[in-house]
Amino acid sequence: MLSEIDHQILHVLGRRLLGRDKGAPRIAVVGNCQSFGIAYGMKLLIPQAHIDRFTIVRKGVTTLDRLAKTLGRYDHVFSLEFQPGFVRGGGWEELKALLPDVAPIPSIVFSGFHPDTIYILDPTRGGYPVEGPTGPYHSAIALYAFLRGMSVEQTIALFGEPLFEALGYFDVWQDSAREFLDLAAASDLDLSAELVRWSRSGPFMYSMNHPKAHVLFDVAKALLTRAGLNTAPVEFSDFAVDDIVRGVVFPVYPEIAERYGHRGSYLFKRSNYRLSRNIGQFDDLAAYIAGSFAVYAKHQRAQLMVPRMIDWDANPEVGRLFAFHAADALTRRYAAAQV
């Protein structure tokens, strides 16, 4: 079955045969779900450019040699890192060996707004991701509560400032910022000023690795500047297209957002890539937890024991924290209901 990058290479080759390549400079953007925002931002900044996006999100039949030959016809090639297996013959490192001038794009990863988010990579299935209501993104609190046999109501009671504080969720920001800036620096970009601006404007991530569109636009501008290309003055909000938001949105919890002067929510958005057919689905906290529990109930405990669960399970204090905060919150709710 052909993947997105297979189709794109066939499209580009067909267009070249017909002599329909127009625009300069010729720019190629290679990468995952973040690549559309980068490519779109570059087109806004250099409207006369010819820009193609080569999406690498699924395994295809294209060989690395064919990809490199296709990309070799462009004036500038920008690429996010990708692992071997998506393209036959290698990954990012092998592509660099064939195309030494390929410019790296930093992967936008930031956990400061989403310290509770984890992946569940099933160790019994070679690390295959367990999908829940929000795709591969899961709540560590919800998963641990399930593993301890808590009810949905008890789990809802856990979500609040006391447990977040005890788990260190308010202490993640600085490490996340440093890791993000280190990734950018590895691509010869200084995005420190951009990070400050994004942080002041509000939560700038839909999940820990899905940035909002204006973030990718700013990264696109930084990449073009690094490449020595002149960009046009443009207000992104006048032309904003956000491809990533069609996927899941893992909310920034209110208690976490408020720490940084913003407003959060417990509204979980499910993915919907067919907007012409339906509007989509959102879950409140209760529905999200119930949906997650229904998924976890179909798996063996060993399939759900990701590193954070192993660490928490090995620490008796974490179990006591969960039991205490669930009971305390439920007691306070009951007392308030009697008033």
Protein language model annotation of sequence segments:
Residues 1-339:
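Extracellular glycan-modifying ectodomains
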